[in-house]
């Protein structure tokens, strides 16, 4: 009897012990994102540039995985950071414009993934930049978001956390210095700098790039401080540390442009000792697998054993169900660039392995079209002045001239994307393949940039994803119309003439953009386009003036004055003023500021008005 009681007691005790252990939460990893603003892989020693001295980042790599192919999706802050925060493609949701003129809403049930972490027991902090282009209650996303935010404030030291730390010492603004500043020596010698082939070799260019290398050193020291804090707290080996740039930059032709210099970012993930079993990679190695910002959220959620919402566009690159071989086999990525500040564009890119395809939907706009903030950098102004003085070689001139409608680059042989192979007969099959991959991608996400921004803002932003699905056939038809620019003009002339007379304003709008892409080749359609200068749709009028003005069939300015004086929205004004700047600066038409009487003059519109009036403040001289 006593023996029975003893055995029963032991069984009960063991049962309680097992119950108590099973009731304890499973230990989960912490996550720290260290983000440097505006820098691509091209400025770090870890990626082969000896002037990018970053010992702290290299120590992360020694204990983690270095990604040779990580991409931001967009080459500018708010769009890239919104992509990072949501794990969704910006043109699919409607937050692809920077600066935003209106906030997009995420689909029902979709939340920023840091909010999902918080709802699953994580302490979430952000120090401090957000720059979101979508509606969000930040108090639901972050326990703390400020320049004082830190994981050290969590109520329970056993509580897992996600902390995002942004550093601005590599930001574009750090290169907005006056000419006199060049008297101050840099730590990096300008004589040691290697300039990209599209840059003129000038003292300003060399000093600017040397100064940027110095900023990277500052970033590295800040990375080291964060890692040391984790060490001091005894949690470094419980924490995945991600270091990356928020997009490329920040010399000219990088930030704001969908070249590798704008999209290809450094990414190093330190693998903690206590959670290395979650990763199918050895510490101190590299991977050639492609990842982008849409993948970061699903990766963190997967490592934290939290399910990923089906609407997210990315896929995990670490954790359960992801092998090193799976990651290594990923070799494709999508990129995009739209209106950034007051400068409009629509560029889409697709990369597969060493091949990069760029589709310029408004190829008649030069890359170097005025953006006031960009041109506060002396190097931009220096470059443009040399172009105007006709002192550049053909490669250096490209930035200020019409682009090709499509571009194809072999990045292995041409890492700076200066030799376009799209017209090379030997690459015709490759071109068709890459063109098809991009087109399929854009159709699969129902790319909302086929709608003018003013139309998208008023009709799509309550739920851009649902709107895209509901209008997928229309988007597909507009995409097909836009792609008539890829065929010989003689083959599409009649179809374009028909579209110019379409009852649908969007078809008239896109037909005119295609005509502008053809330029002089489309001159025979000038008579068909003339009535559209008085179209009932103001944006169609803008595109008619743009096309007819670009071939000098008419003086486009009276039409454009009428549009800007009657436009009711900021978006419509921005589109019209972009066309005015293009026609004045690139084509040579005269602009009279006295003819403009605006109902709205602030923000990006004000920037254009300042520039056209010659009153844009430039503090660099």
Task: Please give the residue ranges for each predicted region.
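Long, internal low-complexity/basic segments
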Residues: 23-29, 36, 41, 66, ...
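Short hydrophobic beta-strand that contains or immediately precedes a catalytic carboxylate
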Residues: 408-409
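Formylglycine-dependent sulfatase
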Residues: 2-6, 19-392, 397-400, 415-436, ...
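C-terminal helical cap and adjacent loop that interface with cofactors, partners, or active-site loops
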Residues: 412
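Sec-dependent N-terminal signal peptides
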Residues: 6-15
């Amino acid at each position: 009897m006593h023996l029975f009681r003893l055995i029963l007691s032991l069984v009960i005790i063991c049962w309680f012990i097992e119950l108590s252990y099973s009731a304890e939460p499973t230990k989960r990893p912490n996550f720290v994102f260290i983000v440097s603003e505006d820098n691509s892989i091209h400025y770090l020693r870890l990626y082969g540039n000896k002037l990018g001295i970053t010992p702290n980042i290299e120590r992360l790599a020694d204990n983690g995985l270095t990604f040779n192919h990580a991409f931001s999706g967009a080459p500018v802050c708010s769009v890239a950071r919104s992509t990072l925060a949501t794990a969704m493609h910006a043109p699919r949701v409607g937050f692809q414009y920077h600066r935003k003129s209106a906030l997009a809403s995420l689909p029902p049930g979709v939340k920023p993934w840091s909010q999902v972490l918080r709802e699953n027991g994580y302490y979430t902090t952000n120090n401090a930049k957000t720059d979101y282009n979508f509606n969000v209650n930040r108090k639901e996303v972050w326990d703390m978001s400020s320049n004082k935010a830190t994981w050290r404030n969590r109520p329970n030291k056993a509580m897992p956390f996600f902390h995002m730390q942004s550093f601005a010492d590599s930001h574009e603004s750090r290169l907005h210095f006056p000419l006199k500043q060049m008297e101050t020596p840099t730590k990096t010698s300008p004589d040691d700098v290697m300039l990209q082939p599209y840059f003129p070799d000038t003292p300003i260019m060399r000093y600017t790039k040397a100064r940027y290398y110095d900023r990277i050193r500052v970033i590295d020291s800040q990375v080291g401080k964060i890692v040391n804090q984790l060490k001091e707290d005894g949690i470094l080996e419980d924490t995945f540390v991600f270091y990356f740039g928020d997009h490329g930059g920040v010399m000219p032709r990088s930030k704001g442009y969908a070249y590798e210099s704008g999209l290809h970012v450094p990414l190093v993930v330190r693998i903690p000792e206590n959670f290395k079993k979650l990763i199918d990679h050895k510490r101190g190695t590299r991977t050639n697998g492609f990842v982008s910002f849409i993948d970061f959220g699903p990766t963190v959620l997967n490592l934290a054993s939290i399910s990923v919402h089906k609407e997210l566009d990315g896929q995990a690159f670490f954790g359960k169900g992801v092998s090193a071989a799976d990651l290594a086999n990923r070799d494709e990525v999508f990129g995009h660039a739209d209106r950034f500040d007051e400068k409009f564009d629509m560029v889409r890119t697709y990369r597969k392995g060493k091949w990069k395809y760029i589709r310029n939907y408004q190829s008649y706009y030069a890359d170097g079209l005025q953006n006031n903030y960009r041109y506060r950098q002396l190097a931009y102004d220096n470059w443009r002045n040399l172009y105007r003085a006709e002192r550049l070689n053909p490669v250096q001139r490209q930035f200020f001239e019409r682009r090709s409608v499509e571009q194809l680059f072999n990045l292995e042989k041409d890492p700076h994307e200066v030799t376009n192979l799209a017209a090379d007969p030997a690459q015709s099959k490759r071109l068709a393949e890459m063109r098809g991959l991009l087109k399929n991608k854009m159709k699969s996400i129902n790319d909302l940039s086929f709608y003018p921004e003013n139309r998208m803002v008023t009709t799509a932003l309550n739920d851009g994803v649902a709107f895209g699905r509901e209008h997928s056939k229309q988007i597909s038809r507009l995409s097909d119309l836009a792609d008539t620019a890829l065929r010989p003009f003689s083959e599409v002339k009649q179809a374009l003439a028909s579209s110019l007379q379409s009852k649908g304003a969007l078809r008239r709008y896109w037909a005119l953009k295609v005509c502008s892409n053809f330029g002089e080749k489309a001159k025979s359609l000038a008579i068909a386009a003339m009535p559209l200068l008085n179209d009932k749709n103001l944006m169609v009028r803008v595109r008619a003036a743009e096309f007819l003005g670009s071939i000098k069939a008419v003086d486009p300015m009276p039409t454009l004055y009428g549009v800007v004086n009657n436009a009711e929205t900021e978006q419509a004004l921005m589109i019209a003023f972009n066309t005015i700047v293009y026609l004045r600066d690139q084509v040579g038409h005269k602009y009279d500021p006295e003819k403009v009487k605006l109902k709205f003059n602030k923000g990006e519109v004000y920037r254009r008005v300042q520039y056209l009036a010659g009153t844009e403040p430039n503090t660099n001289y």
